[in-house]
Design a protein with these regions (language model features):
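Acidic/polar-rich alpha-helix caps and helix-coil junctions
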Residues: 1-224
Length: 224
């Protein structure tokens, strides 16, 4: 199902963009390939070789760029084997490259939908990486609703300005700000399930079912 979302993604977004053309055109550049992805690719290559030390080194370079403390391998911890290293790379890609259109291709190339056998060839990728197959799951969504009956169009207009989170502040201050933000959300908002599931057929929930043969992208006969 094609779903619109109330989420406002600021990443690579021009906040001054005009909707005069229904956002068909944009002057905002798209970064198709950037330095962080190069580091991710190198880390993944080392992971596939089983070189865990180099994998951690390159994942650390990525996290160091955004100011994550170096303790415990920049929060990654210890990787038991090459499969754990590969999974760590895939996780880092999900975080670093979020909203950049990369996840679809990562799922394709690592065959993460299921461990089904295709034409006698066993696929155990998910089992090896310790990941749950995507097949059988479904997208979830919730409304973030105000907990009490609103008495104004913006009932939090007065309290909201006091909430601020500054990643560059001292560690103790930053931690206190995050705690205050969490308290603010827990006090004022509640997650409410959607009346109609995001993935549905005639309003009834359906789960993802990606067949193994879908991994092979065919060519149109006209091309051949």
């Amino acid at each position: 199902n094609q779903e619109t979302s109330p989420a406002y993604v600021r990443k690579m977004t021009n906040v001054a963009a005009s909707n005069a053309t229904n956002y068909q055109y944009s002057g905002t550049d798209i970064f198709e390939y950037r330095y962080a992805e190069l580091l991710l690719n190198i880390a993944e290559c080392y992971a596939a070789k089983g070189d865990i030390t180099k994998t951690l080194a390159y994942l650390g370079k990525i996290r160091n760029r955004v100011g994550i403390p170096s303790a415990n391998n920049y929060g990654i911890g210890t990787l038991a084997d090459k499969y754990a290293a590969i999974e760590a790379c895939l996780y880092e890609r999900r975080v670093e490259l979020a909203y950049e259109g990369k996840r679809y291709w990562d799922i394709q190339r690592w065959m993460l939908y299921s461990d089904e056998t295709l034409s006698g060839v066993a696929n155990t990728t998910c089992a090896k990486l310790g990941l749950a197959p995507i097949n059988g799951t479904q997208r979830t969504g919730n409304y973030l609703q105000y907990k009490t009956t609103a008495t104004a169009t913006d009932p939090l207009a007065a309290s909201r300005p006091s909430i601020s989170v500054d990643p560059d502040a001292a560690a103790a201050t930053f931690k206190a700000q995050l705690t205050a933000l969490a308290t603010y959300y827990n006090t004022n908002f509640v997650l409410t399930a959607l009346p109609t599931p995001m993935d549905n057929v005639s309003g009834a929930a359906v789960k993802i079912k990606f067949n193994p043969n879908y991994y092979i992208m065919g060519l149109n006969t006209a091309t051949l």
